Structure formats: C-alpha cells, structure tokens
Amino acid sequence: MATGAATENQWLKGRVKAVTSGDCLVITALTHNRAGPPPEKTITLSSLMAPKMARRGGIDEPFAWESREFLRKLCIGKEVAFKVDYKVEAIAGREFGSVYLGNENLAKLVVQNGWAKVRRPGQQNQDKVSPYIAELEQLEEQAQQEGFGRWSKVPGAAEASIRNLPPSAVGDSGNFDAMGLLAASKGKPMEGIVEQVRDGSTIRVYLLPEFQFVQVFVAGLQAPSMGRRQSTQEAVVDPDVTATSNGDASAETRGPLTTAQRLAASAASSVEVSSDPFAMEAKYFTELRVLNRDVRIVLEGVDKFNNLIGSVYYSDGDTVKDLGLELVENGLAKYVEWSANMLDEEAKKKLKATELQCKKNRVKMWANYVPPASNSKAIHDQNFTGKVVEVVSGDCLVVADDSIPFGSPMAERRVCLSSIRSPKMGNPRREEKPAPYAREAKEFLRQKLIGMEVIVQMEYSRKISPGDGVTTSGAGDRVMDFGSVFLPSPTKGDTAVAAAATPGANIAELIISRGLGTVVRHRDFEERSNHYDALLAAEARAIAGKKNIHSAKDSPALHIADLTVASAKKAKDFLPSLQRINQISAVVEYVLSGHRFKLYIPKESCSIAFAFSGVRCPGRGEPYSEEAIALMRRKIMQRDVEIVVENVDRTGTFLGSMWEKNSKTNAGTYLLEAGLAKMQTGFGADRIPEAHILEMAERSAKNQKLKIWENYVEGEEVVNGSSKVETRQKETLKVVVTEVLGGGRFYVQTVGDQKVASIQNQLAALSLKDAPIIGSFNPKKGDIVLAQFSLDNSWNRAMIVNGPRGAVQSPEEEFEVFYIDYGNQEIVPYSAIRPVDPSVSSAPGLAQLCRLAYIKVPGKEEDFGRDAGEYLHTVTLESGKEFRAVVEERDTSGGKVKGQGTGTELVVTLIAVDDEISVNAAMLQEGIARMEKRRRWEPKDKQAALDALEKFQDEARKSRTGIWEYGDIQSDDEDNVPVRKPGRG
C-alpha cells in the first residue's frame, strides 16, 4: 500500500481492519516489504455523513449504531479497492475516498440503504466532493422515498434506534461492578464486539445486548508491552469528525468523546516512549482477528485492580478459535501462571504445552530464548519388569531386573519415582530424624510392593549434588534414575506373562492420592513423568480431602530403640523380655549378611541384630557370600517374619529361628537348599526348632552338589566344597593375552578358535560408508555396534557402555565402548560408530576375563599396583607369547557382560608355553603380589596349590623385595574379623 505521500486518484488494494463509524474505515495493505505490521490508512467515504454515536455523557443520534453495524458487517476483514478523492488539511489532513467491495461502491450501498446522508460541498470546498456525487444524491432521494434506514417513516423508529447505554459506555466507569458482572456471567459465553485493541492480550469490548464497555485481559498469557506513554499538549483529533463536517472545516464544534472513542484516539493523544520486541506485531495479530468483530467472551476472574480476566473466542470461517492460544502458538505472548490458574486444567495444560513448544522451536519472541541449564536428561527405551526387593523411602524403590541373572551386582536397580517427592526418611548416622509422614509413606509402599512383580518405565535421570539436600554416600555428584512404576493390570483371561506386560496402578499416583507425597513443580525444560497430569489431579484430590501431609494433624510419634548400635550389655538385658514371647512378629529392615539381619519389632518398638542359630554362610570375601546376601534380599528383605529368640552372643546379636510370615517357611532353608550355607550343630541340634527340616535342606544341596558343596564327596569331611586334593582333570586353555587390567585381571583370546578367524573375516568383508545421519542411529547402553579403535583406526565389534541420554544431537557426542573381542575400553565420538548387521553382532564376544588364582595383586591405585600392572603387561601382552591357562574356578558373580571388568571371570593359573613357573608364582617371587589367606573351608587341592606357591612368597619376603621391603605387611580388611557396624535403617 502507498504511504501518506501517495498521490490522489491512485487505486490501491487493502483489507478492512476496522470500521469506526457508518462512513469511516481503517484499511491495511495486503503486502509489504518492511518488518512489523503493514501500513494502514483511515478512509472516510467521500461526501457522506453518518449519524453520530454517543459521546461522554451523551446519547446516540438516531440510527447511529445501525449505520455503523451495516458497514461493519458488510466489509470487516474483506479485501477492497480504494482511492483517495481529496484531503482536508484543516482536520489534520484527513483523507476522504471511494471504496469498492468487489464491484460494489460502499458509499452507494450505505446511501442506498439509508444509513448516511449526502453532504453537499460548501462554498469554500467545491473541489472536496465525491466523483459519484450525482449518483449518491439520486440514491439518497430513493432511500428517502422508500423510508430506508434513517429515513424510516415508522412512528417511533428513530427513538427506538437510540441505545440505552450504561454509564461505562459513555465514559463513566467509576461505578462499574466487575465482581457483580463476574458473579452473574462466570463461565458463560457472552456476545461482544471488540472496539479497541490496547495490546496483543488486552481488548476493550462492548458486551451485548446491554452495551457494557469493558476492558478484558486474555486469561493465562501476556503479550509484549506497547510501552509507557506520555500525554502531549496537542489537541485530541476527533476520529469521527467526518461524521459531521465531511471536509467542511467550518462545521459546528462536536461534543466530548465517549470512552470508546477517546480510547480509540489515544494513539493521537500520546507519544510512544518504548515498546517490547514484537509488541506491535502482537497487537496487529489481535486486531486482524478480533477488532470490530463479533466475539464470545468467557469471564474467568477478576484481578486485584478490578480488571476482568477472560477467554476470547472468534470465528474463522466455520471454526471457532481461542485468541489466547493463537497468540501463544505464534510466539506473540507468554504463559502467565497467575491468570492461567483461573482456567480449567485442560486449557491451562494446553496453553503451557503450546508455549513450551514455541520455546523449543524459537518462534518470534522466543527467537533468542536459551533454556535454563537442566540437570535432568531423558531416558529412552529402558523399560523392564522385575520384583521389588527394597523400599528405600516413599519415593524410591530397589527393583531386581528379571532380565539380569540372579546374583549379578547389576541385577538390583534403584528407581526413584518420577516427579514426586515424599517426606525424607532422615539419616540416623547423622542424627537426622524422619520427616512427618515419612515412615507412613515407606510403610505404605512396603506393604503394597515388597516381593511383588512390577513394570518399570524409566523416564529421566538427574544429577544430584550434595547441596540439593539429597543424602548421598559420597561427596561428589550422583546420578539418579527416575521412572514410573506400575503394578501389573489384573486383566481377566490373560496369561501371567501378558498380565505382567500390561501396566495397571501407577505407584506414584497412589502415594500422591493418599497424601503421602507432593508433585514436583518442574521448570519448563525439565524432564518429568509421562503421567504428570494424572499426578497433579491426584494431588488436587488429596489436598481437597486434607489427607495426611495436607491435613492439620501431626504424624503419629514413634520412638524406636535401636539395639544394633547399643552396647552388648543392653542387648543381653533385653533378652529375657524377648524369650518370654513364643513367636515375635518382626520386619526385616536390612540384610547384613547371608545369615545376619536387622529386624524391627513393632510390639517392642525396637530394632535388633538377629542371626540364625546353627546356620552359617561363607564369611565376607569368601566364595558365595555375596550370592547368599542377594538371595536373602530377594526372599525376606522388608518382609513380615516371625522369630523365636534363643540367646544373644557376645556382640549383642540375638540368635534364633525365623519364619517368613505368609508362607510359614523357615528362612534358614532358603540358604541351605541353595547350597549357600551349612549347619553348625556343635551345641546340639535338639536346641534348634525344625532342625530336621534344615538338615533335609542341607542334604538336598549336598546331593545336588550346589555351590559350597560342588566338590562334596559322601562320607568325607567337607571344608567349603572339597575333602581331598582332586584328581579330576582341570580345564586348560591355550590363550594369548589381549588386555591387562589392574589387580591381576586381564583378558585373553583362545588360540586356534575358529570363531576368531570367522569374526575377523566378516569384519574385513564389511563396506563401511560415511557416518550415519544424525538421528537415524541412536545406540543405547548395551547395544552391539562397530567402533573404530583410536590407535590403529581398525573397526571392531563393541558394546555401548555409556552414552548421552536421549537422541544424538551432534557427531561429536561421545560414547564409551567396550571392545568385546579384545577386552579394551575407550571413549569414541559418534562419527566413529556404525550400526552392525545381526549376523556379525550375534556371536558372543571373543575376549574372556581372567584373574590370577590364589594370589592377591595390588590394584592400580594401591602401593606397588602400578609396578604389578606393568610387570603383568610386560610378561604377557608385550611378550606376544602364548600361554596355558589352567582354570581353577569360575566366578559368575559378575553377571552379564556390561563393560570392561564384568561378566564371568575365569580364575586361572597362567603358564607361558616356554616357562617353568607360572606367572602367578613369578609375581609372588618379584614381591608384587601376595598369597590369598588360607581359610578353613578351602578345598584340599587349593591348599596344596597354596603350599606350592608359598615358597615363592617366602623368597620375596626374606629378600625384602617389593611389598616386603619393610618387613611383613598387615593383612587387608578382608583378612581380619570384621568389626560390627551399626545396621542401616
């Protein structure tokens, strides 16, 4: 559109943005090349004079409202062609012109329908006239004859056309009752016509049919500010001056403006000081959609300044649209919590989600938006099923993953419930008491979940620092994994497997609905529960019901005497009171070892250390000790049990028998049947309840040669698995060492294995192209890929050990990979990783983890650990020799291979083909290792091997070599009797 400098009589095209009276329009350009809203013109129809609407304190001229409504409904929002016929400089250069809607001349239509009269030019303004003046005069005469519009001949029609306006419509808003209007109309759609757009989110509107003139702020959002304004000394230009003078500067003086007209003219009576970016664009966006349009207003509330807050709906063809949502969706307004709280939850959620998407896409006002730093990252594709082993608190569980072998250190996974926070349990070691309702929240989950199969959907991880108030075991940051936990859905007709795969009740929602936790209010870009809205709804119900933490009641006081940290004398003093009770109900709080536990006795309000009478597991550090602990955690951890107390030992540990409450099973049989414990009846089996059941369980394990009985021979004295030096042929492998770790551990490949050659041939045949497109390949933890080794650029099979959470964003993102055929591990960029064909990835890794048998090698961080590592590296990896690896035992406690140092470990004697002594003996001789401590339960063949190795250690000790430089060294902690520590609560 041409600017104000355009010449007259030039036809232009535009769109009608506003109709201010029955003869005046605001027209905007259809296209423009500058930033911001398009230019616009105010055009008064030449030679016409429409009736005047009411001013401040006044009333309408007859038919004024109908005149404006005729023109408004005829052309608002439509494309028109127009030209300027003349200007009147005396009234600020106001432009008068001819406007065509399609083939229709708007001036002719207005006059023809009787909504304006034709103004004859004065003596001084003979040139200020419409080019269609003759036709207009003829049409006016016809309208008068027919009685159309203002020329109506119906008696009383003129008086009836005058609106009965309330004070707010004529400039007197002092007595306007906003609260009364809200009370009468809240939530009900009200018809209205928008008279002015103050800014993108504030409109002034006539509410029909009473014509209340009100200002409405769009609920839930705020558009950029139009800036502060300063009053000027210039006279206000009457926007409707043409309704009287139509170019005649000598016309009579007009009365005062109404509130609506005064506000419409405010742009001329003030000077813009400053405005926010996109303020003009937001205002124009709203003007283009609702200015002078029919809208529906739904009042939602009133603020402290008596301003009305509401939702604004307008029609776009056959569709009804929400102005607020449209503004936010187009990046022209921001979400505002305080007024959004007046909306219903669904509308509030939609508005918030729309803003978040705009921020992510950096639309308009969010173009330079930088999200705040977040310590949470999404977790993808890590759903699993498992059994709940432990309830740590009201918002944290330990779940045993069904897919990971029993006994593996990685089987138990700690899962924090997403987006909720329960009262903290405190820390007895720091003398921190549980918060109110913390015990109730934990107990609720314990009774609901312990031993139950659950479905876990991991959602995000969060880095927690000590300053965040979360108790951590170390001083550094800790990464916690959050997810949603569900009980399986009890669907009829489903198999157990199908039911287990269908999520049922959300545990977090159960906690929140009972008032035992609160929902975390996340920041915009923080990861959150996928069921966040359900959690908020549950919290609202709990607050309304004043449940637990939302009530005014204090939580029940509970004082527990912890005898596990008390003196042995106090425990002995307590013994008679426990012996008097036949069977004591208790809860297993913690598994201290395979046969020793911390129990809570509700009836006595005390915690005790408890051990089985006559049943003993391997000691700490001995074979199968960790497996025994893992078994008892799954079987009785946090379960309800019954105990009989027989005695107390010198450390204050109570001795007796225990039964799992539901099954009435003697808990000692779990260990004995699994071959993880043995009977000790030196003081008489007759004193042990159900001793015959325990003996049967032990006999069954012996017959099956389970665990500690694997080398048992009937009739011979057994010391943890063997009775004499075995004559069985031990497995011997011919190997080469491929990687050396610390502590006497290393990886080998079997020499002559056809799998090695097959894998190498398959890799050589691969054609590796360019790096995959970002986003098309997102390897996750545990996946097998091809990775390029940094030292020789060769491509090898590798397992992802660690990587970025979520989708890959850059080729430089780093992944930690474990080369499954060689045993080494390194960090490589995404560009050095390729997907691998299943035919190549399906074969097991060729690298086998081994450990030198019968000796203890210092770790890399210990004294002489570096020397030991370098020596082992020199005699194995650097020498390139082949070795015989005699397998003494297999350690399966490492579970599945998850990275370097995990998986099944072969405990071997390593002998070079051309050497006389083993590497094990050589390291003892060099003083960079020492022998394992002899234990009573060791097999006789192991004791014989230790006898043979002892001379090499004695030689190093006598010559003060290596670790023996300063004489005998103290045994490590494993060799000493462990000091009893306070049990964890």
UniProtKB/Swiss-Prot annotation:
Residue ranges of domain Tudor in the record: 778-843
Gene Ontology MF annotations: mRNA binding; nuclease activity; RNA binding
Keyword tags: Acetylation, Cytoplasm, Endoplasmic reticulum, Hydrolase, Nuclease, Phosphoprotein, Repeat
Residues modified as Phosphotyrosine: Y966
Activity control mechanisms: Repressed by the specific inhibitor 3',5'-deoxythymidine bisphosphate (pdTp); this RNase activity inhibition impairs subcellular relocation upon abiotic stress and leads to reduced stress resistance.
Coiled coil stretches, renumbered: none
Modified residues (Phosphoserine): S971
Annotated segments matching region Disordered: 228-255, 963-985
Broad class of enzyme this protein falls into: hydrolase
EC code: 3.1.-.-
Pfam family, one: SNase
Domain TNase-like: 10-153, 188-368, 382-552, 582-711
Localization annotation: Cytoplasm; Cytoplasm, Perinuclear region; Endoplasmic reticulum; Cytoplasmic granule
Superkingdom, taxonomy of origin: Eukaryota
GO BP of this protein: cellular response to heat; gibberellin biosynthetic process; mRNA catabolic process; mRNA processing; positive regulation of gibberellin biosynthetic process; regulatory ncRNA-mediated gene silencing; response to cadmium ion; response to salt stress
Gene3D superfamilies listed in its UniProt record: 2.30.30.140, 2.40.50.90
Phenotype reported upon loss of the gene: Normal vegetative growth, flowering time and flower morphology, but delayed seed germination after vernalization (at 4 degrees Celsius); this phenotype is reversed by gibberellic acid (GA-3) but increased by paclobutrazol, a GA biosynthesis inhibitor. Reduced expression of enzyme involved in GA biosynthesis leading to reduced levels of GA-4 (e.g. GA20OX3). The double mutant tsn1 tsn2 exhibits severe alteration in germination, growth, and survival under high salinity stress. In normal conditions, moderate reduction in root growth due to cell elongation defect.
InterPro entries reported in the protein's UniProt record: Silence_cplx_Nase-comp_TudorSN, SNase_OB-fold_sf, Staphylococal_nuclease_OB-fold, Tudor, Tudor_AtTudor1-like
Modified residues (N-acetylalanine): A2
Phosphothreonine modified-residue sites: T961
Tissue spec: Mostly expressed in seeds, and, to a lower extent, in leaves, flowers, roots and siliques (at protein level). Accumulates strongly in the cap and elongation zone of the root apices (at protein level).
Predominant location category: cytoplasm
Recorded GO CC terms: cytoplasm; cytoplasmic stress granule; cytosol; endoplasmic reticulum; nuclear envelope; P-body; perinuclear region of cytoplasm; plasmodesma
Function: Cytoprotective ribonuclease (RNase) required for resistance to abiotic stresses, acting as a positive regulator of mRNA decapping during stress. Essential for the integrity and function of cytoplasmic messenger ribonucleoprotein (mRNP) complexes called stress granules (SGs) and processing bodies (PBs), sites of post-transcriptional gene regulation during stress (e.g. salt and heat). Involved in gibberellic acid (GA) biosynthesis and seed germination. Essential for stress tolerance, probably by regulating mRNAs entering the secretory pathway.
Protein name: Ribonuclease TUDOR 2
Species classification: Eukaryota, Viridiplantae, Streptophyta, Embryophyta, Tracheophyta
